[in-house]
Amino acid sequence: MKFVDEVQIRVDAGDGGNGCVSFRREKYIPNGGPDGGDGGDGGDVYLIADENLNTLIDYRFERFHAAERGENGQSANCTGRRGKDRILRVPVGTRASDEDTGELLGDLTHHGQKLLVAKGGFHGLGNTRFKSSVNRAPRQKSSGTPGEVRTLKLELLLLADVGMLGLPNAGKSTFIRAVSAARPKVADYPFTTLVPNLGVVRGENSRSFVIADIPGLIEGAAEGAGLGIRFLKHLERCRVLIHLVDICPVDDSDPAENAVTIVKELEKYSPELAGKPRWLVFNKMDLILEEEAVEVMERVKTALAYEGPVYQISAISKEGTKKVCYDILDLLDTMPRQLAEDARDAIEKVEFKWDDYHKNQLAQAEAEALAASMAFDEGLDEEDWDDDEDDGVEVIYVRD
């Protein structure tokens, strides 16, 4: 199946149902009061994370998704049925943002997590809601509000513990084949890897970690050269980065300059990503003499001002790969996952369009009715108030 990690879709929440104007009319009850019911709320649109999915390709061809409209209110104080919600299933690791405003709606980082992305319209109010002491037969109602319409940008960010960086043909795919059961394509030309690959590295005592191999970077990737930096986003969730350096490039380029190029492109993309723990791993050590290798490694470390751990491996023969993996396992044990907490802290409360639409509507109607009642009372004199009935014959008794 084709790997698709970024799509744009439109989601339409359901409109709210309209309120109803109706009066109770039954035999022997000629003056029944209002009985118009409220409409139903419009359906919402949700994203839900599904661990059985690994690509967003389904949304490449189906881009419009709408929830159901709420039904209108009916007589006899019958409330309209609420519209059905629309549930969109996406892979774990999907990030949703509003394409128009740039607002980050949320990250779906574990199976079954649910995210509201478009809120349905609020229901309209029936005329029963507007009944008051001075308005016994209200003929006003309110219409339901439209549901939210959003253009969403969905990005799939792979959930890996370790990410690999390097120029094309540095040996990243060969390394991941050597340490895991993943089988990415390996060939002797640049950009053999066109999409990210994941591999599971298993150690002793049931310990394991997930490693991500992304397409190689070249100079100018931040400006769109090569495959650009679109795949660097898959490293944002990684806890450790492996910078794989080809110590003996086939094009006779300088390994030190190549290493500096990768770090610069990383810093251009994200200073936060560049600040993650990064290990320097020299590959293809079997193709160079030991004295030359020492000199090249010193030049690379000096160019990068690097003081962290350094590893020497040959991915094709698996020499030195086990030590790298075991040391990574030890490091990860000291770096507990904080993905879910960090994601919740980073995302601000999402404001939806109709959250407070009718918050004061009923209060305002009650205030207007109270004001009308007070104005009516002030227009009456005290002598106008008596307990006599206005209809029928009034009899006055006079004492002799």
From Swiss-Prot:
SUPFAM superfamilies: Obg GTP-binding protein N-terminal domain (SSF82051), P-loop containing nucleoside triphosphate hydrolases (SSF52540). This is GTPase Obg. GO terms for biological process: ribosome biogenesis. HAMAP family: GTPase_Obg (MF_01454). Belongs to the TRAFAC class OBG-HflX-like GTPase superfamily. OBG GTPase family. Monomer. Its cofactor is Mg(2+). An essential GTPase which binds GTP, GDP and possibly (p)ppGpp with moderate affinity, with high nucleotide exchange rates and a fairly low GTP hydrolysis rate. Plays a role in control of the cell cycle, stress response, ribosome biogenesis and in those bacteria that undergo differentiation, in morphogenesis control. Residues 160-333 form the OBG-type G domain. Its EC number is 3.6.5.-. GO terms for molecular function: GTP binding; GTPase activity; magnesium ion binding. GO terms for cellular component: cytoplasm. It comes from Aeromonas salmonicida (strain A449). Mg(2+) binds at S173, T193. Keywords: Cytoplasm, GTP-binding, Hydrolase, Magnesium, Metal-binding, Nucleotide-binding. The lineage of its organism: Bacteria, Pseudomonadati, Pseudomonadota, Gammaproteobacteria, Aeromonadales. Pfam families: GTP1_OBG, MMR_HSR1. GTP binds at residues 166-173, 191-195, 213-216, 283-286, 314-316. Its main location: cytoplasm. It is an enzyme of class 3 (hydrolase). It is found in: Cytoplasm. InterPro entries: G_OBG (IPR031167), GTP-bd (IPR006073), GTP-bd_Obg/CgtA (IPR014100), GTP1-OBG_CS (IPR006074), GTP1_OBG_dom (IPR006169), GTP1_OBG_dom_sf (IPR036726), OBG_GTPase (IPR045086), P-loop_NTPase (IPR027417). Residues 1-159 form the Obg domain. The keyword Metal-binding applies. Disulfide bonds: none annotated.
